[in-house]
Amino acid sequence: STLMRSSAASDVYKRQIEKCAEEDRYDFVRDILIRYKDLKRIYGYKIKDYWRNIASVDDYYSTNMDFLKADVRNYFFKQYPDVYSKVDDLPPAKYNPGSQVRNSLVSSGCIVNGVVENSVIFKKSYIGNNCVIKNSIILNDVYIGDNTHIENCIVESRDTIRANSYFVGEGEVKIVVERNERYVI
């Protein structure tokens, strides 16, 4: 039956993912699709337009930043509007007096009190007074205290950035801020 085939395929897929993780290999395309294409029955669909392989933190960063480009947004939300995600019935983002947002995506449930430029802000995040967020990705449920400067960073979900903090990645170097720790990539 179709259900049994789907379940069996899912089990094989899960085993391959676990095997790759044990060997510290995390690139789905290189480590699974290409590696097993001649050994397993792998089928695909040719994508003519936008597609990115996210195999590193830099890939994750650049792919998120691609959504700041109008042509990429239009591809997903106008040309193919049937892209669905989880719905959280949250209020729209709130921009308080004095806030400034330029070339950024700010999700529902966010409150912005500072300056946000060229950044992607995921849902339910709070940007404090006099903050500057530039060229960064702020994941879900992040609290950023007042007078904080974040640039060229990825801030992990459910993190709290204390007031008067300063995180700046230089050039191609990105900083991943995770649970009040700092990792340079």
Regions found by a protein language model. Give the residues of each.
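Single conserved hydrophobic/aromatic residue that forms the stacking wall/gate
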Residues: 1-9, 13
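Left-handed beta-helix
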Residues: 19-185
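A generic structural signal for short hydrophobic patches within well-formed alpha-helices
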Residues: 10-17, 60
